UniProtKB/Swiss-Prot annotation:
Pathway: Amino-acid biosynthesis; L-arginine biosynthesis; carbamoyl phosphate from bicarbonate: step 1/1; Pyrimidine metabolism; UMP biosynthesis via de novo pathway; (S)-dihydroorotate from bicarbonate: step 1/3
Gene: carA
Recorded catalytic activity of this chain's protein: hydrogencarbonate + L-glutamine + 2 ATP + H2O = carbamoyl phosphate + L-glutamate + 2 ADP + phosphate + 2 H(+)
UniProt keyword annotation of Membrane present: no
Gene3D superfamilies cross-referenced by the UniProt entry: 3.40.50.880, Carbamoyl-phosphate synthase small subunit, N-terminal domain (3.50.30.20)
Subunit composition and interactions: Composed of two chains; the small (or glutamine) chain promotes the hydrolysis of glutamine to ammonia, which is used by the large (or ammonia) chain to synthesize carbamoyl phosphate. Tetramer of heterodimers (alpha,beta)4.
Keyword Ligase part of the UniProt annotation: yes
The enzyme's E.C. designation: 6.3.5.5
Protein name: Carbamoyl phosphate synthase small chain
Length: 376
């Protein structure tokens, strides 16, 4: 058991609501969008997911950190969130494989964590008022509240930043299984808008060689790589900001190359086809979201992490809706008519979450197989 010295900490929302707790991570202050996640497990995967970049994540489940941290379960190279808000954490690690506590993990990554917060009250407030920005401090609670509100206001004026450029790879990276023969893999180019490691692992397990490219990579270069398929990854932020990505996708749609979009990639694909995007009141963040597959009429339980949704009323005639949320009827999946192109709003790789949507990766590979066969 680790001995963690608890200092007083504070969360202030932009409407002035204050929550007092104890510091369990790094010392400092930060400002970010406060969202809540309803997952019971998978806290490590959540806070290392680049889709949460620049956000403050509040966990609704009361006990976080019970099994500690296993570094191999990270979804990126580091913690991506601005801060973590929770009710209670545990520094007694119950998994024999894990040697690092949740609190120590936050501290080593210089991330603020606050425990002792009434996360149910916080969640109800966000559900009622909508997502708010907040200020967190682990440097004590004796601060000037007027000054903090002013800082939040200044931050809000700059909130539409290009977050993708801050999380994308800076160079091309190749991922593949060792000892795989050249003619026995599918050549997939993945746009890194903030990709999770689990997406790469799932595609590799299906026989893919992944060429991960920066988010700003020109479509002409991607086509020159002679891909069998193109993946548009998950990532953070408002999709309408990423004009460069939308233009590249529009060019790629002029080819016959199969395209699969996930989360942010799903939204970008829709925008590239003329659709509009809506900012959700408090988003979908959790691993228990029921989604209806309109093609099979079955319900799948999915992992979700998004604050924007496609406006169904703006879809062009070449788009078919394939999935909808059973919580609020928001659009969850689309495919294009007469093109090997489709996308899904949730996370088929889960991590954390159920595996109900893994079949979408196989659907993508089936399109890739057909394309590869016909282009020879």
């Amino acid at each position: 058991m680790e001995n963690i010295l608890l200092n007083k900490a504070l969360l202030i929302l932009e409407d002035g609501t204050k929550f007092y707790g104890n510091s369990i991570g790094a010392k400092g202050t930060s400002i970010g969008e406060v969202i809540f996640n309803t997952s019971i497990t998978g806290y490590q995967e959540i806070i290392t997911d680049p889709s949460y970049f620049n956000q403050i994540v509040a966990f609704t489940y009361p006990h976080i950190g019970n099994i500690g941290i296993e570094i191999n379960n990270n979804e990126s190279s580091k913690i991506q969130v601005k801060a973590v808000i929770l009710y209670q954490t545990h520094n007694i690690i119950s998994d024999f494989r894990n040697k690092l506590s949740f609190s120590r993990f936050l501290l080593l990554n210089n991330i603020i964590g606050i425990s002792g917060i009434d996360t149910r009250k916080l969640t109800r407030l966000i559900r009622k008022s909508g997502t708010q920005y907040g200020y967190v401090s682990s440097e004590g609670t004796n601060i000037n509240f007027k000054e903090i509100k002013s800082k939040i206001k200044i931050f809000l004026e700059k909130k539409n930043l290009d977050l993708v450029k801050l999380v994308t790879t800076k160079r091309k990276i190749i991922y593949k299984k060792k000892y795989i023969e050249k003619n026995f893999f599918y050549n997939i180019v993945a746009y890194d808008f903030g990709i999770k490691f689990s997406i790469i692992k799932n595609l590799i397990n299906l026989g893919c060689r992944i060429t991960l490219v920066p988010a700003t990579t020109k479509s002409k270069y991607v086509i020159s790589l002679n891909p069998d398929g193109i993946l548009l990854s998950n990532g953070p932020g408002n999709p309408e900001i990423y004009k460069y990505a939308i233009r590249n996708i529009q060019c790629l749609l002029e080819t016959k190359i199969p395209i699969f979009g996930i989360c942010l990639g799903h939204q970008l694909l829709a925008i590239a086809n003329g659709a509009k995007i809506l900012k959700m009141k408090f988003g979908h963040h959790g691993s228990n979201h029921p989604v209806k597959d309109l093609e099979t009429n079955k319900i799948i339980i999915t992992s979700q992490n998004h604050d924007f949704a496609i406006d169904k009323s703006t879809l062009s005639k070449n788009i078919i809706i394939t999935h909808i949320s059973m919580f609020d009827q928001t659009l969850q999946g689309i495919k294009l008519i007469n093109k090997p192109v489709f996308s899904f709003q949730g996370h088929p790789e889960s991590s954390p979450g159920p595996k109900d949507a893994l079949f979408l990766f196989k659907n993508f590979i089936n399109l890739v197989k057909d394309y590869r066969l016909n282009k020879k």
